[in-house]
Amino acid sequence: MKFVVGCELEEFKDYYRRNGFAGEQGTGELGITEEKIITQDPAHLIVWRQNNEIIGDAIWHETSTEEHREGDPRDLEDREILRKLCGGKKDNIVELHEIWLIEKYRGKGYGKRFFEFFEEFIRRNGYDSFVYYADHQAALAICRKRGYAEDYLESAGEYVFYSQLESHAAQ
């Protein structure tokens, strides 16, 4: 299994449909927001391939404590939680928007491997921190095991994880 940055959009949409991901209003179609993120910068899509087949994906984007994306302000509870986790207002954060892994590939350590890859990937691309909203038990377990700072966003029913990455010089 390997992680590949970027993917041809039609191939990705086909994978999304075939695997019945909820997508746009539960239709199995890639959501408008997700498609916009990928179209604006194909490197914001990371696919997980095994034998040249897509078995999982992650979508990410730049964010801040004040806005999800430019022009999309966070609500008060979300802003307060992020400011607390980040130690104040902060720009140039990565938000891990979505992670999917086909069910038959779960429980094989791929999630752990992904977070190791992702941390190094964003560090190499000039970011020093990321945030991830999760409610899936396996994701919660991985984030807690990795020691990410955590809070609960009651309005969304999700946990918010924040990681301040160590610089290469500190390692």
Located regions from the model:
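Short amphipathic alpha-helix that is part of the acyltransferase structural core
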Residues: 1-36, 40-66
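Short beta-strand micro-motifs in enzyme catalytic cores
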Residues: 44-46, 92-94, 157-161
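Conserved acyl-donor/pantetheine-binding loop and adjacent beta-alpha core of acyl/acetyltransferases
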Residues: 54-98, 106
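Conserved acetyl-CoA-binding loop-helix of GNAT-fold acetyltransferases
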Residues: 101, 107-120
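Conserved active-site alpha-helix within GNAT-family acetyltransferase domains
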Residues: 112, 124, 135-155
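C-terminal "cap" of GNAT-fold acetyltransferases
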Residues: 136-137, 152-171
